């Protein structure tokens, strides 16, 4: 008991962690990681609410996502606060090997989505590519993206979306 099994880092790094300076640095890095994670969650949640309000204002209640990620999970959790139906998630990268994600149906091609009114990009890794692929499947105005994704193809800012 009390032994540390060295598996994912060099042994000298663990020796550093055991020093007061190393322990302090590891604690600081951990706190910074959690701070960034919570910041991401708060920003994503706020932007998600803006996107849902934008959709509801236009009568778009059947919403689909493009991409399985932490962002799609946050969007699914936020959806419970709005009068919308989540019709599915398209995993165009083929990375996800299941029929559901967080109780939402997963499909491999946009054409297999059940008549969404709008598709919101939630792909964190290849968001720009996903956006471009969706343009060939859906009208441009029916494809939305989170501003935090930084998609260059998506010119609208969140506040402009709700104003139009």
Question: Model-derived features: where do they sit?
Answer:
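Hydrophobic, well-ordered beta-alpha structural blocks that scaffold small-molecule cofactor pockets
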Residues: 1-5, 9-164
């Amino acid at each position: 008991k009390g032994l540390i099994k060295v598996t994912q880092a060099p042994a000298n790094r663990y020796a550093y962690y055991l020093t007061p300076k190393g322990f302090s640095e590891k604690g600081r890095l951990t706190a910074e990681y959690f701070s960034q994670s919570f910041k991401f969650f708060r920003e994503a949640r706020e932007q998600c609410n803006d996107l849902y309000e934008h959709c509801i204002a236009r009568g778009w209640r059947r919403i689909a996502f493009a991409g399985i990620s932490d962002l799609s999970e946050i969007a699914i959790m936020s959806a419970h606060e709005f009068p919308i139906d989540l019709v599915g998630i398209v995993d165009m990268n083929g990375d996800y090997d299941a029929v559901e994600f967080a109780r939402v149906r997963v499909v491999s091609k946009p054409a297999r989505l059940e008549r969404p009114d709008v598709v919101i990009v939630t792909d964190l890794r290849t968001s720009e590519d996903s956006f471009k692929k969706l343009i060939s499947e859906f009208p441009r105005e029916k494809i939305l993206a989170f501003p935090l994704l930084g998609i260059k193809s998506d010119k609208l800012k969140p506040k402009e979306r709700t104003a139009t």
